[in-house]
Regions:
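Short, acidic/polar
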Residues: 24-33
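Catalytic micro-motifs at enzyme active sites that drive phosphoryl/nucleotidyl and oxygen chemistry
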Residues: 31-32, 89-97
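A gly/proline- and charged-residue-enriched helix-loop-helix capping module
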Residues: 66-92
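Glycine-rich loop at the start of a catalytic domain that most often binds anionic cofactors/ligands
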Residues: 51-62
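Catalytic domains of carbohydrate-active enzymes, especially glycoside hydrolases
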Residues: 34-41
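Active-site environment of non-heme Fe oxygenases that use a 2-His-1-carboxylate facial triad
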Residues: 1-23, 84-90, 99-272, 278-301
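Residue-level recognition of conserved beta-strand edge/terminus positions
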Residues: 45, 276-277
């Protein structure tokens, strides 16, 4: 296979281009993950592409797939990005919940003709540019996300997350709260309360500045979901761990800093983007081309 590697920005990202329309599934997982360790996100460009190729690429690099049942499916791996047309703030995918995957993938089946770009922001670079007061504010205590989730949504999520595992429940009626705990990260600060109507309210405590799960040397990344969306779910309440709100002035400062380090993917037809979801945040410019078609997948190494 004939490929060319080129930096996407001066501080993060790598574009891996096939010069002969090669098979994207022929790239080894070790090669991709090693490059991801260094660069934070990858853009695979110029390869032969289809939903089937994308799904196979995701499965071969992952130990487990995470599906959001609130989105539309294309097979058992890819889901269509359908989060309306407005701008989407920077976030780690599912970073406001204890179901936070390692890897975030995108596949561009049809590139936008104008605007409508997915954006990326390297949390490592953000941390390096934070001033002492900003670092102190976010390292002195964790942040907490809390919200209510309807019974059907949390049970459907658990059903999909456990699918294929030995002894997994086969219908939504078999799902219990223990099943939901089973698919959460075991090392997170999580509390789940079941409500009278079968819904749950969860709280998830996590640092705003975290270490990458993929590269243990990258210990300080401003990677979180304090600016992120809540499509298909109730908007979470976001506070510091002591219950105090994050000051508007601090949020505005961080928003400006992150925006200064945010870049567009620059979609081309057939692109696949792979993101370290514990280092690099992503978002979206306002949709101007409603015919663009992007698929997403979430997974664990």
């Amino acid at each position: 296979m004939n490929i060319k590697e080129m930096a996407h920005t001066s501080h993060a990202g790598l574009v891996i281009t096939s010069l002969d329309e090669g098979d994207v599934t022929a790239l080894t997982s070790d090669y991709l993950l090693n490059q991801l360790h260094t660069h934070g996100y990858l853009i695979l460009r110029g390869f032969r592409h289809s939903i089937a190729d994308f799904s196979e690429r995701v499965r071969s690099t992952s130990s487990r797939i995470s599906l959001d049942p609130a989105r539309s499916f294309d097979g058992d791996t890819a889901q269509k990005v359908d989060a309306g047309y407005d701008k989407v703030g920077l976030h780690c995918e599912n970073g406001n919940s204890p179901f936070w995957p390692d890897l975030c993938w995108f596949y561009c089946q049809k590139a936008p003709t104008q605007g409508s770009q997915t954006t990326v922001c390297d949390g490592k670079a953000v941390y390096e540019h934070m001033n002492a007061a900003q670092r102190a504010a976010f390292t002195s205590q964790d942040i907490v996300y809390s919200r209510r989730v309807d019974e059907k949504k949390w049970k459907t999520y658990a059903l999909h997350a456990l699918a294929g595992q030995p002894g997994a429940p086969t219908t939504i009626d078999d799902i219990t709260l223990e099943h939901l705990y089973a698919v959460a990260q075991s090392d997170v600060g999580m509390r789940i309360d079941k409500l009278d109507d079968g819904a749950i309210r969860y709280s998830f405590q996590t640092p705003a500045i975290i270490g990458s799960r993929l590269n243990t040397k990258e210990t300080h990344n401003f990677a979180n979901s304090i600016f992120g969306p809540s499509n298909n779910y109730e908007t979470p309440v976001i506070t510091f761990a002591d219950g105090s709100p994050i000051p508007d002035t601090l949020l505005a400062e961080m928003d400006d800093l992150c925006e200064s380090l945010t870049v567009d993917v620059g979609w081309q037809q057939g692109d696949i983007v792979l993101i370290d979801n514990t280092r690099v945040m992503h978002g979206r410019r306002r949709i101007e081309d409603k015919d663009r078609t992007i698929f997403n997948a979430l997974s664990y190494v």
